A protein has these predicted regions:
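Internal, conserved structured core segments that host functional sites
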Residues: 86-133
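N-terminal short beta-loop-beta anion/metal-coordinating cradle
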Residues: 1-78
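Secondary-structure boundary elements
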Residues: 38, 93-104, 162-167, 195-199
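Short, solvent-exposed amphipathic alpha-helical segments in soluble enzyme
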Residues: 29-33, 89-92, 186-189
């Protein structure tokens, strides 16, 4: 696996990959569209499905980086198969370290059984690495994720980031497990706005929620299959060592 392309030094890298409720994927796509970010790099691997993305008659790779000075985004048009989780996580963090990022913020979903009863999903944060990251979350009014498991690419990137000394934050929005959740993505982006001082408008996510659900349902279906193999439902459990 290799990443082809260069990033912007001293920039935040936002990672949003297909996961529970497609929270990360929807968030990443919305950031790119809202800020008009251009493709700067892509992932090449034989572990990826044999897919290309065609947009306005131009060909793109399915897993790619977008960016500008100060901010980069990693998004994917395809599910992250379990066999891809470790090599992708390590490669992304290694590339981020080489490019001299300021830090990595991963956006993901934390599935809850009663999501249907919650009008405004909560967003929790995990801070790893530099001590001031916890202060950043507190100042942004993001609650700490106190106990539990996190499964998937976000978990690997957080762990690898900490090992390499890269400031790492994970934002987890309450969401549906196997149903696209633009509402959860909107809340995650509002938290991101507060953390980084951005002004990403989330109103389109809420206004076009049903359109987004229809447009992403096939990606959600294929992602759900991958999540089952990764035991994503394991996140409902409490760690035995800390009970």
């Amino acid at each position: 696996m290799k990443i082809v392309g260069r990033g912007f030094k001293n920039s935040w890298l936002i990672v949003g990959l297909p996961d529970a409720g497609l929270v990360g994927a929807i968030s990443a796509a919305h950031i790119v569209k809202a800020l008009g970010l251009e493709t700067i790099a892509h992932v090449e691997s034989e572990l990826l499905p044999p897919v290309i993305v065609v947009h306005q008659s131009r060909v793109y790779d399915p897993v790619r980086f977008f960016g500008r000075e100060g901010l980069m985004v990693l998004g994917s048009e395809v599910p992250v198969h379990p066999s891809l989780v470790y090599p992708l996580g390590r490669s992304v963090v290694e590339w981020a370290a080489k490019e001299g990022v300021k830090g990595i913020i991963t956006i993901t979903g934390i599935a809850i059984p009663n999501r249907l009863d919650i009008e405004v999903p909560e967003v929790y944060g995990i801070a790893g690495g530099a001590a001031e990251l916890s202060d950043m979350l507190a100042k942004a009014n993001v609650k700490n994720f106190e106990e539990g498991f996190v499964v998937g690419p976000a978990a690997i990137m957080m762990r690898e980031g900490i090992r390499r000394g890269i400031p790492s934050i994970m934002l987890l929005a309450q969401c549906f497990l196997e149903y696209p959740d633009p509402g959860a993505a909107a809340q995650a982006l509002l938290a991101l706005n507060r953390i980084l001082g951005l002004e990403i408008d989330v109103k389109p996510l809420l206004d076009e929620a049903e359109v987004i659900r229809v447009r992403t349902r096939e990606l959600m279906r294929r992602t759900a299959e991958a999540l089952k193999q990764m035991r994503k439902a394991h996140e409902y459990e409490v760690p035995l060592m800390y009970t």
